Amino acid sequence: MVSVAGWSLPRPRRNGPPFHSKSNVITVLEQVAVLLELEGANVFRVRSYQNASRTLGSLEEDLWTVTQEGRLTDVKGIGKGIAGLITEAMTEGTWGDISSLYASVPPGLIQMLAIPGLGPKKIKLFHEELGIESIEELRVAAEDERLRNLERMGAKSEAKVLDGIALLERFSGRRRLDVGLLYGEALEASIAEMKGVERTQLAGSTRRRKETIGDLDIVAAVNPADVASVTEQILALPGIADVKGAGSSKVSIILGTEFFDSGIPSTGLDGGVLAALGGEAYEELATNTTIDAQIRMVPPHVFPFTLAYFTGSKEHNVRLRQRALDRGLRLNEFGLFPVDAVGELKGLEAAEFSLPATEEADIYRHLELDYVPPELREDTGEIEASTLPSLVEASALKGAFHNHTTASDGVASLEQMAQAAIDMGWEYLGIADHSQILQIASGLSPGELLEQSESVRALNESWADGKKDFRLFHGSECDILPDGTLDYTAAERACLDHVVGSVHQLPTWMKRDEDENTAALIHAVEQDDLTILGHPTGRILGGRDGFEVDMHAVLRRMGELNAEGELKVVEINASPYRLDLDWRFCKFAKEQGVPVAINPDAHSTQGLKDVWFGTQIARKGWLEATDILNCRSGADLERLLW
């Protein structure tokens, strides 16, 4: 896959055609237009891609249907050449010769596009006249006053470039789910208490529990007469770093850490989120970041439609709109209308003709669908499914298997971790300290591992004597070495109840290709005593991508081994820094007969509560309690692991 500064040609779907979604096609067309402009292409060629992307964005028909029927050139703004590109992408999964365009543009030029106020024309100018190819080089040039003498520049424009770079550094990038929830739940709770607000709900990718989010979307039910007052109350909130806009129905702000300084109405917070984010210490958490937020105020009778629309995803909404059209209805953020009834009326003017809805479930009922939980709204089969899964709840978890103590790099003792699990109502806790090769994390020597095994046995005996319904499982997070073998010898691992196999020697794995890494992981899961494949790709959200691996092939092999009577489990590492296994693979794991373990990878007692985040990812991946290993009882697990 060709990639430049985070821009890339998307991978084709495995179950195509169609091999790409409309969203993918639009993104590629938008990116190609920019790349062509940076290269100095003919302005009409650039505009053709810009127009095509805009046209597809407003196309209500199903793109795959239009493509199959050969009607792309009938769509205004799509010429023969671009129609051919779209057809190839949808039917074959490939993108013609535009991959060479991605490869030809220096990555730094793409990165500069994120600087506020800077577009392709100026970036091209800086590159051609001064050879600038990175944000840092641009900063130095501006500080040295070398930009002001260029065409269409000056001292003020130069200063704006520096201001833009400073803003980018402060506000750029996506946020992890936990950061989004930290701000989002608090902001929603604050708005819910404002006079004039009847209902409010966090929407967008945060509500859908995406692993990272771009900004916050909140929908509030407010009568028109109260909008001005509610707007004033929002703008009076503490910690607003900037106001991007405040109109008649929408307020756009940037929130900073100071938002938490005066305390948050915790009575309005989700209990699971509150516990996962730090419990009573929630208000004291330092996020060291900012986040954009949009608050949309709509009349109460419109609220369910606006909430559904801004929850998304775009792809899910497109499918809903098409389903509505198939039934003679029109669906948007203001309502669900019989097409014949509203004519040319739009927006709130048409809302009085809408079919009634007090909750989102009513919208789905009108469209002859079961209610789709927000986590599933990604156009991954939720519309077609005859029955949707009963998604796992965090309360169904009875323990976890991947946790650390002071024996390696944890900050709590074996006894403290066990007591924290007991306090959470769990039946068991699995310990998996690092293995000997990971000295940076104080990995245990074989002798230390055996000593820990004895400590676990002694604690279990004491609980059994005291009739306490709790036990520890003794495991190890054994490094998967580059050749796919496990740290420690088989004899040294024999004292363990379970083995969590994880990759930590990332430099080697990151350098290798997909085939080598896949073969090594498959070799690892084929080891008789490997129980759980831990954080399968090694990614750190916002820090590094995972190593290349064919996860489908790995999960397929694990399923084969399970069919032969073994127990091979894949982990959703619930740390909000990882959330790995990615939710996109969860349904496939289930189909292959591979159980999932939601593990917090806890290094402290508070870290145990990260399982809540892992549960959100499991839900997003269509998983039920029966798919989760640690929803089973301690007695069941004793039989499985021994």
Which positions does each model-derived feature cover?
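Charged catalytic cores and adjacent phosphate/nucleic-acid-binding surfaces used
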Residues: 6-10, 18, 209-210, 214-223, ...
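Two-metal-ion RNase H-like nuclease active-site motif
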Residues: 200-202, 399-403, 477
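Universal eukaryotic N-terminal targeting presequences
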Residues: 1-3
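Active-site catalytic microenvironments in core metabolic enzymes, especially phosphate/sugar-handling
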Residues: 475-478, 613
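Accessory alpha-helical DNA-binding modules that contact the DNA backbone or grooves
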Residues: 5-19, 23, 33, 43-216, ...
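The substrate-binding groove and active-site-proximal loops of carbohydrate-active enzymes
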Residues: 407
